[in-house]
């Protein structure tokens, strides 16, 4: 089957924002105005298409990323709506990994908010081109100019308006297009009918000034255009758009648009901007992969190339079972064909291919380079794994996910629930790389760990609804970590003789702190002191032993281990012997490398009326919090601080109490830091 849409006319983009900025409402309006749906669903009514889970409908928030596709001006648009709550940041992470562009949605009253900064950093890490949509211009307190300033100050990027709102709050009724010098006045109806009129006199000077600034900024991306601009020549609309597109694709320029998704004002202009400025799959740098020899390979976005795809999400569908979401980077994948999972070196059959529209599936026969679909039938592929055909053997760059910071114990209410609970936890862990489940070796309890209380609350609720498992839930616990604070060289030797073939493994390892870099294993063996086949078992032995640290049995992180010497026995050495020797070396290091306990530190932003400012500051300090700054916004005070997660349990209730229900806060994981000695002693005592 031939390609129906040229690759140059594809747009793979996501919508990202802080919670309640209006992402899903924007997505719904895009679906409606593109003709994908014919009835507008609202998040506050639980009727939106993209928020299809029961928990999303009840809570009015997005929990899982939802994919769909629409058409606009001869272009095919793959759209992914992502969550705004920090607990579900994994959905943003894996979506941005496979998208070519994004719309960052801001609340016009709030401007840049904490989760805006988080998702912006995620997008920057993957070098995703972005346009910015200042939403809710109809909201009380909406201020476009202040929102643009917050982008420049808090995100530190070149954000330049290409639109100007006419009015704000209840008086917001039009948008000035600075590029084409046109004005659109909206009738307020759901069809978003707009009347083109001349620029009102009171805006003419401002438009002239802002357009000149826009042209000056985009001229930086084209030498000839800059020369024409400096000579005072007229710059064409086509040249301005071409240079904006160039700046956006290079992540050097971020155009700012405005509107009100809820009131159907500015959505069609936003769709025009997606087509005009966000890249197609052929506009972005070629995907990097690595061959069997470890050398870098660039993947060409071509139908004629071998098939290469990345599984970026796994979901469970009650009707068809496992859905594996895949971005196709090159080649063509057909229904009924086979793919190879490179990491697991395993072939799997593609039973069916489907294009998703939220939770609905539309079956297709094939998928081509640059597109996104879901595969039915893959049993062993998980998030972040590369799929290829038999003509190529490469692995795409891996995805990085945050580690859980909070845990709690769960137990089945009845014996009948025991097996069902194990199946449910296994399936949920397959779907969500930031959700972990394990058995506490001391108590035998089943522990679930995630990114926050809401994250775990949703997962427990899903167990009850989707898997019909009733569970008892314990109180939330902090997920502490352990690490080494001092460098030292240690030895691990395992010798076992009991008649017949014995066991022999001997390693010398240098351990040192590796702050914020995770576990790093370095092989410095020379001269065959340890045969190559035993190096990997040494690493595996260390990784297994690091699951339980020397202080209180918490997992170990941020350690560099350099294997520099050792010995072996021609007959008695084995992989198992070297695994055990490595674990003994780590145990010895626990005695000499000054182990320390690390606790998760949360970045919080508290908003309270002026009269509660002092009480709030005092309360944060009493929780071992470090105040990082305060800011006056209208008639409220915003306090930014770093506080240990251990001290934040019950904070919502306390804040509500001393602010008489008028305070609110947002919180997200910041980093791990060494725990004070007094707290360490308390924690170790509870573990004994």
UniProtKB/Swiss-Prot annotation:
It is found in: Cytoplasm. Pfam families: EFG_C, EFG_III, EFG_IV, GTP_EFTU, GTP_EFTU_D2. Residues 8-282 form the tr-type G domain. The keyword Cytoplasm applies. SMART domains: EFG_C (SM00838), EFG_IV (SM00889). Its main location: cytoplasm. InterPro entries: EFG_II (IPR041095), EFG_III (IPR009022), EFG_III/V (IPR035647), EFG_IV (IPR047872), EFG_V (IPR035649), EFG_V-like (IPR000640), EFTu-like_2 (IPR004161), G_TR_CS (IPR031157). One of its GO terms (molecular function) is GTPase activity. The keyword Transport does not apply. GO terms for biological process: ribosome disassembly. Keywords: Cytoplasm, Elongation factor, GTP-binding, Nucleotide-binding, Protein biosynthesis. GO terms for cellular component: cytoplasm. NCBIfam families: EF-G, PRK12740.1-3, PRK12740.1-5, small_GTP. Catalyzes the GTP-dependent ribosomal translocation step during translation elongation. During this step, the ribosome changes from the pre-translocational (PRE) to the post-translocational (POST) state as the newly formed A-site-bound peptidyl-tRNA and P-site-bound deacylated tRNA move to the P and E sites, respectively. Catalyzes the coordinated movement of the two tRNA molecules, the mRNA and conformational changes in the ribosome. Belongs to the TRAFAC class translation factor GTPase superfamily. Classic translation factor GTPase family. EF-G/EF-2 subfamily. This is Elongation factor G. It comes from Mycoplasma pneumoniae (strain ATCC 29342 / M129 / Subtype 1). The lineage of its organism: Bacteria, Bacillati, Mycoplasmatota, Mycoplasmoidales, Mycoplasmoidaceae. The gene is fusA.
